[in-house]
Curated annotation (Swiss-Prot):
It comes from the Eukaryota. Residues 50-54 are annotated as: Complementarity-determining-1. Residues 1-19 form the signal peptide. Residues 20-49 are annotated as: Framework-1. Residues 69-85 are annotated as: Complementarity-determining-2. GO terms for molecular function: antigen binding. This is Ig heavy chain V region RF. Keywords: Adaptive immunity, Disulfide bond, Hybridoma, Immunity, Immunoglobulin, Signal.
């Protein structure tokens, strides 16, 4: 019984080490209305090229919004109407990096932006 508990604990600890997913965003800043900004997200701890990725934002009112998504090979993308034609999501699987090019920025684009797996 005691051995069984130790084994389960060991498996859980090892699983936690193997699942050390890290996503680090960069490129944010203050921009004038109508301006542009490019965000980057460096990924590690998982096989980046195997996953759909997305960008989400948290508004000043704490609401979460999906702003863009891309499939694993970059061949298919999705945008809600609020950003369509202004935002472009892309990825570089060789560099394990996700990008979000934002242009014609509006006041309602003010938010914290996060990449997500």
């Amino acid at each position: 019984m005691n051995f069984g508990l130790r084994l389960i604990f060991l498996v859980l600890v090892l699983k936690g080490v193997l699942c050390d997913v890290k996503l680090v965003e960069s490129g944010g800043g203050l921009v004038k209305l109508g301006g542009s900004l490019k965000l980057s997200c460096a990924a590690s701890g998982f096989t980046f090229s195997s996953y759909y990725m997305s960008w989400v934002r948290q508004t000043p009112e704490k609401r979460l919004e999906l702003v863009a998504a891309i499939n694993s090979n970059g061949g298919s993308t999705y945008y809600p109407d609020t950003v369509k034609g202004r935002f472009t999501i892309s990825r570089d699987n060789a560099k394990n990096t996700l990008y979000l090019q934002m242009s014609s920025l509006k006041s309602e684009d003010t938010a914290l932006y996060y990449c997500a797996r």
